[in-house]
Amino acid sequence: MMEADRPEKLFVGGLNLKTDEKALKAEFGKYGHIIKVFLIKDRKTNKSRGFAFVTFESPADAKAAARDMNGKYLDGKAIMVAQTIKPAFESSRWVPPTPGSGSRSRFSHRTRGGGSSPQRPPSQGRPDDGRGYVGYFDLWPYRAPMPRKRGPPPRHCASPPHKRRDPGDFVPALREYSRRYYGHSSVPDYCPXRGDGNRNGYRGRDHDYMDHPSKGSYREPLKSYGGPCGAAPVRGTPPSYGGGCCYEEYQGNSPDACSEGRSSEALPVVLPDAYSRDHLPKAYSGGRSSSSNSYSRSDRYGEEGCYEEYRGRSPDAHSGGRNSSSNSYGQSHHYGGEGRYEEYRGRYEEYRGRSHEARSGGRSTDAHSGGRSDNAYSGGHDSSSWSDCCGGGGRYEEYQGRSLDANSGGRSPEAYSGGHDNSSWSDRYGVGGHYEENRGHSLDANSGGRSPDTHSGGRSSSSNSYGQSHRYGGEGHYEYRGRSHDAHSGGCSADAYSGGHDSSSRSHRYRGGGRYVEYRGRSLDANSGGCWPDAYSGGHDSSSQSYRYRGGGCYEEYRGRSLDANSGGRSPNAYSGGHDSSSRSHRYGGGGCYEEYRGRSLDANSGGRWPDAYSGGHDSSSQSNRYGGGGCYEEYRGRSLDANSGGCSPNAYSGGHDSSSQSHRYGGGGRSLDANSGGRSPDAYSGGHDSSSQSNRYGGGSRYEEYRGRSLDANSSGRLPDAYSGGHDSSSWSHRYGGGGRYEEYRGRSLDANSGGRSPNAYSGGRDSSSNSYDRSHRYGGGGHYEEYRGRSHDTHSRGQSPDAHSGDRSTEAYSRGRNSFSNSYGQSDHYGRGGRYEEYQGRSPDAYGGGRGLNSSNNSHGRSHRYGGGGRYEEYRGPSPDAHSGGHDSSIKSYGLSDRYGGGGHYEEYQGSLPDAYSGDHDRSSNSYGRSDRYSRGRDRVGRPDRGLPLPMETGSPPLHDSYSRSGCRVPRGGGRQGGRFERGEGQSRY
């Protein structure tokens, strides 16, 4: 009779000798909470013996694990998993050894014909010590005395006694298991051989492991079980571990205790009492095969299914630049739901070795090294272990490998964290864990490419690590308490981040109850290119006490000298020139007012050549729940996010690499967020491809195609004057912030003037845009007015060649190339909602839209409209005069038509023409023109009159039409009889 003695306890056999406790816990942990993982090791060598015990908290979890894992491959070897069982015999009495009965084993065997010594009660032998688990692995430390004198073994196989149960009841064919897991059977059908026990038994090589009356032996002869001639051991009941097979430890002489089985001599195993307190687990991988570093199967973000992330065994871009075919991610519910998500499944090799590819610019064997190293990403280590990343009860080890983005400006292969673990286990945004974020060498490697472990200047910032806390919830303490050398000094200062002070007091960062003093120290990221130790706020308190995004308090954001000190190592006050760049307000909610970005510039992305450049090598803010809620806001999308090359490299973002490939980054099915091409293509961001496909980025029910154009942040390596999108639409339909409308973001020449400092229409130019700042308003809601960009003073948008922002010239005020732009200013309106009107750019003087030719652009002015909603019309840029979109030519045919730009039922005709313009770098980009359509909605045609039988505007070979929106007043309908058609980008041949 057999029964599960401890159903929560599993026996795991057939293990690879390189598999350690951590790998076992990772692999089995997905089935439930594990109390203990006990890997059997050799006492002398402390090496694995190839089997282990895993104890779950729940027997049901253990049963599920045994069912699923039995026969699966772990680190290249098929393993056996079974619940430990208790063999129950009709007699529970222990049988002492038969005097004079020697054998190969140290233990005597009863035979059918032979007698046995009188039985003694359990109290005299190996007792059942309350655990009820009696087996050959539990004989330690209790041993009955062994006779000193050994007699000759039996001459033949004796039949078992009549009360002896068939060994198959508790030890199924051992040969079957050993053949399956070790290549051939090492358990022959045999009778105990003749000979002296001292020569044939365990005395020879392992004589020191002979039995002792006081201590007992810790080895068991596995040959004693399961053979047709084998009898029950007289000193204990035979063990079994369920699952239809008995585990046989490899008995050969090979160092690999689980590999071949060339010898019949059993190797020792160490089984300390109560599952070992003596032996520590082996190191994780140390840069070797990442098979044991693989992610376990788990519901990473959800509840059902299995997640096999990074389960292979060979190193790849994550582990040293070798074959990543087996490192692919397996099936999983990545973020929940019911289907299976296979991320990096099969033979997808991202950063796959030595082939030239767009991400490495043809130089590198992997992506993140900037073309110089083949192990930039994780240096052979596992860069993320198993977890429930954003929920549940798991633990999250984020970015354990050497680097995240290898953002070292292309100079170091270990830019990110220098091979250290920069994030320990935690529920990152969840409930009960601790979060220690950024413990390693660096967070963003923002040292301008001067140090091998870029962020910390070659030193260890581990003591600066965040303390235990619930970062976004709970009641712990928060972050960055140390004072030693850390990442933000660029290798120059020992106290770059907080000047030796506690840069964040106790608080609930985004939750109620506490106060949050954020970035009180000298700097946030010391993004000064390694030149200034106080890059962030010049030693001032850059954030007063507040609830950052929650109700009740006031928020003074970025009061210090700068936001990110992204000065490329030239200026300590890059962002706001020492002024308060944000007054008190509830930023996006409540009843206050918000003055956003009053300082010098918003991004000042001038390519790292101006003292107040945004990205000259730095960035302190990556993706986060900046504004709360369920979405994520990616801030600072200038030249680079993390790997700002220090103003030295044209591949500003991450050295030509994508640190997030195919995935649902924020939900949906997008491809990638930052697939940078290595700075060799004028469309540096995504190589002309759509780097983020359909998804609901921030919610809603529509699709968001973000960054569809050539680049997001003018990642053109400084080669094109149309740095932003290279003539394409870099953001298509979407519900950016939710709701039912659609939002087209960043359609202009560039967002951040990311032209590498070579274009006259650069965004940031390095001038003061404080007077051009946004006025007080409820930017995204409420009932106030929104006056956008009214000023006339010198600002950042001219790239240092003109005192104004949008003109790219030398005029004295921002918008109109030297003329009075008061009339060009935006009128009062509800910019994004409710019942007001939006008068955008109503004036009549020469302006930025007029190309500086001095012509009257009154007809170019925007008409009254609800720009993003309501029932009005939007007349954007109707006139015939030269303008910024046409490179000084007549763009009347490119003018925008009457329409509700973001709502209503009209058509939106955007940029249909064929003339050289800011989008095309002075080349003919007719195929890039936008077609007439309802770009953002369906509905009634408000462009022209009913159908006149003309072909659709985007049809190839259509005859050119008149300028329907020129001053001649000619209104030629362009709908072809189709009312409310959806907008489609003119990727092919355009009629204009």
Swiss-Prot record:
One of its GO terms (biological process) is mRNA splicing, via spliceosome. Residues 91-130, 144-169, 188-207, 278-385, 397-511, 562-588, 644-992 are annotated as: Disordered. The keyword Membrane does not apply. It comes from the Eukaryota. InterPro entries: Nucleotide-bd_a/b_plait_sf (IPR012677), RBD_domain_sf (IPR035979), RBM (IPR050441), RRM_dom (IPR000504), RRM_dom_euk (IPR003954). Keywords: RNA-binding. GO terms for molecular function: mRNA binding; snRNA binding. Gene3D superfamilies: 3.30.70.330. Transmembrane segments: none annotated. PANTHER family: TRANSFORMER-2 SEX-DETERMINING PROTEIN-RELATED (PTHR48034). This is RNA-binding motif protein, X-linked-like-3.
